[in-house]
């Protein structure tokens, strides 16, 4: 396998290094994902084109634009999924018995990801896929539901 010297990171807030500040409860970019160490230890250059709120649908559009402009890299790290599988929690709280779909339904998520992978491979760019980090369900639920009727959301 060839040395992947030029890497582009394409994903959501996790790959961007955005976290919630425990004091202010606001989003901050901390960049504690170790890109400088990776560049140094593995002789890489990494350009982080990740975006807050990105899903596979937005990622596919971003990748298309990058490819049209002549994306010059050896590999693309892709980290999507968290925003794809999110729900509109206020709508769930207002109508818990109704059907609610994730932001990007699973068939579209699969189609978008496969399309991105295929486009990269056609250009001899290695797709590097990551998986979501584990989350703490109670903290996640409390954060996203906030002041909503959590009992209704649980139904």
Can you describe what each PLM-predicted range is?
Residues 11, 17, 53, 129, ...:
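Glycine-centered flexibility motif
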Residues 28-29, 53, 57, 107-110:
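Conserved phosphate-coordination/catalytic loops
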Residues 2, 61-155:
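Alpha-helical cap/lid subdomain in secreted, periplasmic
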Residues 13-16, 42, 51-56, 82-86, ...:
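Solvent-exposed loop/turn segments at secondary-structure junctions
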Residues 1-50, 66-72, 76:
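Serine-esterase "nucleophile elbow" of acetyl-processing enzymes
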